[in-house]
């Protein structure tokens, strides 16, 4: 499929993860991590093969066209080294310009990104973290300039980057219009009122340039302002909608590496006169971990396609993806670490310690670009309006048109229109296409053409799960209505608001994964068509703790073992990895 071809080329271009002389190998990643070394050579290589083009819209000379494309490019990097992935991902902060910049700014920033610029995001401050409205960095307007004062702290690429996406106060009040957004070219500010803050040592991704920048009467031109004065919070939050969705690439890459290493260990390790992989409990654990990874991938794919199909709903979709995808991979990590046993605690006793690096690195994914608490808080305040928008649509729903739109969202074979970032909204009043799709999903599960080849037992289980999702949806809708209709309760029971957001997110995810499978089933490889992995995921996500049926476990595990033995990504996509003896080749990844 076209949306995965660039990532497939990148994977082959980067060479084998087992080549010790390769900057993109696991051994190189571990060596840099031990030295806390910034991956500059890897960054230069990625620029040379044209990956930077995928952050710039096509009308500005780039290749930023397909949501899934950038997701999988970063997944390819993340399975090798989350430090490289995190460093290079700061290019995505240019989205703030595509959202709010004027024509000249868009062209100028596009040229900078295409020439290899290294941007950073300067939102957070040491005293305030994610509380942007409490920001203390100020931008005082003069006739032709802004004068900056204050410090931005804990910023990726703050020192080594050459550009900054900055949020600063342009008003003394604390309201939402007190902040403005700027794009700074640090090359024009050298020694002119700016200074670097010390690099911060980190638990994982130790080679990152996590530092800060300070301003002391630093002057910038008025044309550094993105959008209008007072639009900073709006533009910043819209940009975060996009970057939060792409954070899932970190989880997918780390999850692939951890599950691959743990499975290979189980295949090789012998205990009690038999291979560990032959132990039923271990087989169950690995099958469950694989189901989590596939579900995380599917939720990420649906999110990426949502940027095309219903971008005005993305203010609720993005926090769901950002919360749950890392959580699914954290569950995978908990499972696979138990498979490794004592080897998990030893830093380099197996696979040179790459599992431990991926485990450490992934710990921060649920925090950056908005923690789970921040994301659920954002989601919770939109539950009423999203449900209201969905209810309005239900009254005027054309079933044929609705199904075509659901297919556009879920079906990977259906090409989507280009993303228009200017259509992003701060608040979702349009409804929820995933939640709306459940009725059609249930209809398709009762359609003999859609379910041909499924066993009676599997079909019965999936129909039962889908019906249960509908019951849960109606119950949750009522709870949301009751909560927001009682203003006193809304003020008093804040924890209930978070609980409703959590319930909404988890329901959304299960519907999305089921919907993806229903609409793509006949295009998936046979091992995934039978729904075994899906049932394991749905059962686990619903809190069922009893072991999966043996046939479900074995069907899922067989596919996992096949992906590893044939050197494929652990994915719903048939994605071949670079051969074990492949060398990196500095070749353009664009056709």
Residue ranges and their predicted role:
Residues 137-140:
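A structural signal for short hydrophobic beta-strand segments in well-ordered beta-sheet cores
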Residues 263-264, 281-311, 326, 519:
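Loop-to-helix element that buttresses phosphate recognition and phosphoryl-transfer chemistry
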Residues 149-195:
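A short core secondary-structure module
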Residues 54, 115-124:
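A short, Trp-centered hydrophobic/proline-enriched beta-strand micro-motif
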Residues 202-293, 404-508, 512:
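Glycine-rich beta->alpha junctions and the first turn(s) of the following alpha-helix
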Residues 1-88, 108, 424-492, 501-504, ...:
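Amphipathic, small/basic residue-rich leader segments at the start of a protein or domain
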Residues 303-402:
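Extended amphipathic alpha-helical segments with heptad-repeat/coiled-coil character used for oligomerization
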Residues 82-104, 129-132, 142-145, 267:
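N-terminal glycine-rich flavin-associated loop
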